[in-house]
Amino acid sequence: MNCFKILHRIKTGKEGFMVFYISLFLILWLAAGFAVGMKQVYVDQLFDKAVIERLEKEANDHGHADRMIKQRVLYIAAVTVSGFISVYYEMKTIPQRRNIRKIEKNIMKLNQAKKRRMKRK
């Protein structure tokens, strides 16, 4: 019964609104980071074998980097805590990804043209 009175005071007072908005902000912060982490790991295939090998070559000097590279859950947790910062950097890379897709399409067209030439011979 006493807990309900305390909760009622928090809800009705100015402190209650402040706590409510801070908690709402933190929930949104963590949800945004979690969504970006899940997208990077499972949609973008960040932990693909080729990517892991490249990251391991770059991280030869850092012993702690291996833990971060190999454990998906640890990576998702770190991105979750970073919140909207990770969302910002994810949005910042969109134009670069578009350019990469254009380059990949051009390479595919060149490969198809090469196959056609090989079939003619």
Swiss-Prot record:
Residue stretches spanning the membrane: 16-36, 74-94
Annotated localization: Cell membrane
UniProt keyword annotations, A-Z: Cell membrane, Membrane, Transmembrane, Transmembrane helix
Principal localisation: membrane
A GO term from the CC aspect: plasma membrane
Membrane topology: Multi-pass membrane protein
Protein name per its UniProtKB record: Uncharacterized membrane protein YndK
Organism of origin: Bacillus subtilis (strain 168)
Gene name of the record: yndK
